[in-house]
């Protein structure tokens, strides 16, 4: 099942580098970096690559993204879109290298880059940070307003909502459209076949030869589209829950342990417990905790999962660099 209050008995899982969590999948997150503002010996700056069928979406490329992609077996040609939450360095300093690698490797398809429009000056500085032979495939998509629909993918809806951080910040929600599966055997038994089935799907109803109205809903099932959410630097806010609503996979910052809730509030970040509460309120299926402060050593990492699990009873992954996390299979 999904999230909910603590007390349920569901598996808790914790990630380690170079591993794969949740089995093989055509929809899979590769975690490139998991540190907070300061990288450590064990954790590099942010970077998250989501493979979603034919799409390859790179979120928040921090320093070292190019190199981590090499370790993960990813190339510039795999990137079809970039989504930047905000222009703090740990979420964007890898952008110049990624853009220049796209140009150098001759990527031929459009690579759309969504980012907060209020940070346009930083986008331009990063986009043209050094001398290189440029490319015209990189397409800027500045975001504005209280809700932004990010265009470009025909089979995927990407929504961006503002979060509460010290600079303009957006979180992202990817939604696969629901699909209608027609029950052909039942229609055949009713004498409805061929072009009539197409009309029924297109219009939602038809009138049969006897003058009886036939509703599509009575002869079909709906396959719910899957949802992925990416919520980076923010304090607790309603938009974090809206972005994560019914998500199959939520990637969320958990910079601090609950004992540092005061620091989290001061710098507009989340604690592990707060991340768990957001996941529970949103009904998430699998939760990935990341963006871990450099103040915590390896001996304290288990506490992140414990504190999130006090509120959320779904699967929990404490992300490590180069771990792969599958989007859970359809229910």
What are these language model-derived features?
Residues 1-7:
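Intrinsically disordered, low-complexity regions enriched in glycine and serine
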Residues 25-72, 172-174, 220-231, 249:
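Conserved beta-strand hairpin/beta-sheet module of binuclear metal-dependent hydrolase folds
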Residues 59-62, 79-87, 116, 228-234, ...:
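Active-site neighborhood of phospho(di)ester-bond hydrolases with catalytic His/Asp-centered motifs
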Residues 118-130, 138-144:
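A gly/proline- and charged-residue-enriched helix-loop-helix capping module
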Residues 143-147, 237-331:
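Binuclear metal-ion centers of metallo-dependent hydrolases, dominated by the metallo-beta-lactamase
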């Amino acid at each position: 099942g999904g999230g909910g209050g603590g007390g349920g008995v569901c598996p808790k899982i914790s990630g380690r580098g170079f591993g794969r969590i949740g089995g093989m999948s055509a929809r899979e997150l590769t975690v490139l970096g998991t540190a907070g503002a300061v990288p450590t010996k064990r954790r590099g700056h942010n970077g998250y690559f989501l493979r979603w069928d034919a799409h390859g979406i790179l979120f928040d490329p921090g320093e070292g993204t190019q190199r981590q992609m090499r370790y993960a077996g990813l190339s510039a040609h795999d990137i079809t879109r970039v989504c930047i939450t905000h222009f703090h360095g740990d979420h964007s300093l890898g952008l110049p290298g990624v853009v220049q690698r796209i140009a150098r490797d001759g990527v031929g398809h459009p690579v759309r880059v969504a980012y907060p429009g209020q940070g346009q000056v930083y986008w331009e500085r990063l986009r043209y940070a050094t001398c290189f032979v440029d490319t015209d495939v990189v397409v800027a998509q500045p975001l504005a307003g209280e809700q932004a629909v990010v265009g470009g993918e025909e089979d995927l809806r990407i929504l961006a909502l503002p979060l509460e951080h010290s600079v303009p910040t957006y979180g992202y929600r990817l939604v696969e459209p629901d699909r209608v599966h027609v029950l052909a055997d039942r229609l055949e038994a009713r004498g409805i076949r061929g072009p009539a089935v197409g009309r029924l799907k297109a219009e939602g109803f038809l009138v049969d030869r006897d003058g009886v109205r036939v509703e599509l809903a009575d002869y079909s099932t709906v396959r719910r589209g899957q949802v992925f959410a990416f919520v980076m630097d923010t304090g607790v806010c309603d938009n974090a829950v809206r972005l994560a609503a019914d998500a199959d996979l939520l990637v969320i910052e958990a910079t601090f342990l609950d004992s540092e809730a005061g620091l989290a509030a001061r710098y507009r970040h989340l604690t592990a417990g707060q991340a768990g509460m957001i996941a529970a309120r949103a009904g998430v299926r699998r939760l990935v905790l990341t963006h871990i402060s450099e103040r915590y050593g390896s001996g304290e990492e288990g506490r992140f999962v414990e504190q999130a699990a006090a509120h959320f009873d779904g699967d929990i992954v404490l992300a490590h660099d180069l771990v792969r996390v599958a989007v859970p299979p359809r229910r």
